[in-house]
A protein has these predicted regions:
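Canonical positions in the second alpha-helix
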Residues: 69-71, 105-106, 140-142, 177-178, ...
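Structural signature of tandem alpha-helical TPR/SEL1-like repeats
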Residues: 57-66, 93-102, 128-138, 165-174, ...
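N-terminal leader/linker segments that initiate helical-solenoid repeat arrays
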Residues: 2-74
Length: 255
């Protein structure tokens, strides 16, 4: 990872990316999402969920399963994704609609979590045979609709050359979009780009602290740990006593 971290540090040194925290909003169904010109690739009926890190779906709240199903039947994309998540988590479907059918309906309406999940399933199913164009399209669409993890996934794919041709410029472009969409993990990647071991790039502990702080405010506990390390080792500027007290309070127990 050294080379890309060096590139991040060199390109972002002295620049600040505005922090725009991400919140997935409940939305009314949107028109069916346009498909790429390539042939459509649909997930199989019973994919293997074991190696797929699915995003957390919104909870039912005070609604019953029957109420959520009624909303899904009426075209509510979020409810459709909630049913997918419910049945994919091991609950037996009490109708003839499998989990994947609800996922497909939600994705076709442009629901960001459904687009992201569908893309991950397609990538997992293809393995080392390359990434379906629809999966890339779905990740881009999910990111455009505010789900920052989709941009981060695209960053990793193009950085690692996993199923696509590795491209540093493309990877960094998606990383920047993830930051702009409020991804704490993306800010943390940039923070590490200013630390030793970044492949020969500039070392700037204050810049590392700045980006780690943005990541921490977006919920990254790894960023909190990095901040504490920088302060304990007197690597960053500031009143370390007060800052350490504050950030140690932000560190949640791991158990």
């Amino acid at each position: 990872m050294g080379n890309i971290l060096s590139s991040i540090a060199q390109r972002l040194l002295g620049r600040k990316v505005e922090c725009q925290p991400h919140r997935t909003q409940r939305r009314t169904p949107s028109p069916t999402i346009a498909q790429p010109s390539c042939s459509t690739v649909r997930p199989q009926a019973s994919p293997n969920w074991t190696h797929i890190d699915l995003p957390q779906a919104p909870t039912f709240g005070m609604r019953s399963l029957a109420e959520v199903r009624a909303e899904a039947e009426n075209g509510d994309a979020e409810a459709q994704y909630q049913l997918f998540d419910y049945y994919a988590s091991g609950h037996k479907a009490d109708d003839d609609r499998p989990a994947m059918e609800w996922l497909t309906k939600a994705a076709e309406q442009g629901y960001p979590l459904a687009l992201y999940t569908s893309a991950l399933i397609q990538i997992e199913e293809k393995g080392d045979k390359g990434i379906p164009p629809q999966a890339i399209f779905y990740l881009q669409a999910s990111g455009e609709r505010g789900f920052s993890d989709a941009y981060l996934q695209l960053y990793h794919l193009y950085y690692e050359g996993k199923g696509v041709e590795a491209n540093e410029d493309t990877a960094l472009g998606y990383l920047r979009q993830a930051m702009e969409a409020g991804s704490g993990a993306a800010y943390l990647i940039v923070a590490k780009g200013f630390l030793p071991g970044n492949g020969g790039g500039p070392i700037d502990y204050d810049a590392a602290y700045y980006y780690a702080e943005q990541a921490a405010h977006l919920g990254s506990q790894q960023a909190v740990e990095l901040i504490i390390h920088l302060l304990e080792e007197n690597l960053a500027s500031g009143d370390h006593t007060e800052l350490l007290t504050y950030w140690r309070r932000q560190l949640r127990p791991s158990h």
